[in-house]
Amino acid sequence: MADIIPNISIDVALFGFKGIKLEVLLIKRDKKPEMDQWSLPGGYVYMDESIKDAAKRRLKELTGITKLYLSQIALFGDTNRYPTRRLVSVLFCALIKPEQFKLIAGSDAKDVEWFKVSELGKLPFDHNEMISTAMLWFKNEIWREPIFINLLPEKFPLNQMQNLFTQFLGEAIDNRNFRKKVISQELVEKLNEKTKGGQQRPAFLYKLKRTI
């Protein structure tokens, strides 16, 4: 086994959307410090691998998830962020459809589960701050890049897309303005189909344009 790079680690904030609430993937730690606490998946970097490869490796070892595009978005280096020694962490993030991946806890993870971002309690280390940082990064990118493409189903009503945007932006969006903006930017294509069932009036379905 290759030696690790001392004092450098990675953490991954992985978000999923099941149609209603935005969720983040956490592992139940099987080692000290913070044994049995839920935290972001992460770990050390080997001397013979890149930072991003370390993030992909640890995500696979801890959760079973593979073949993701990870964005490197921030560096966390407060002197007291880790209890036993000075440790700098590189934060990566990604968006996925949870139903497309089978979760398998491994390595030093006892369990792995999705948690609603809006209902998170206090997490170990600075992981709450990491999640907030990732959310802010997505907020700044959401109109510039179609990052939401990995979260929406193939067909969806516009209110589902609007709900997703609202959770990233952290504020309510006017229905008419939202509809006008996504159509003017040619992000979606209207289908000749409507939602079925439920108590609400049927709404037209849309799909993301293939050019995205």
Residue ranges and their predicted role:
Residues 191-212:
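Long, intrinsically disordered, low-complexity Ser/Thr/Pro-rich regulatory/activation regions
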Residues 163-172:
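Short helix-coil junctions and helix-kink-helix linkers
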Residues 145-154, 168:
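Conserved helix-adjacent loop modules within structured domains
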Residues 9, 25-27, 33, 40-51, ...:
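Active-site-proximal cofactor/substrate-binding loop regions of enzyme domains
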Residues 2-10, 53-56, 62-102, 141-148, ...:
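Active-site segment of metal-dependent pyrophosphate-handling enzymes
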Residues 93, 103-138, 151-159, 177-186:
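NUDIX/MutT-family hydrolases
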Residues 1-38:
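N-terminal strand-loop-strand
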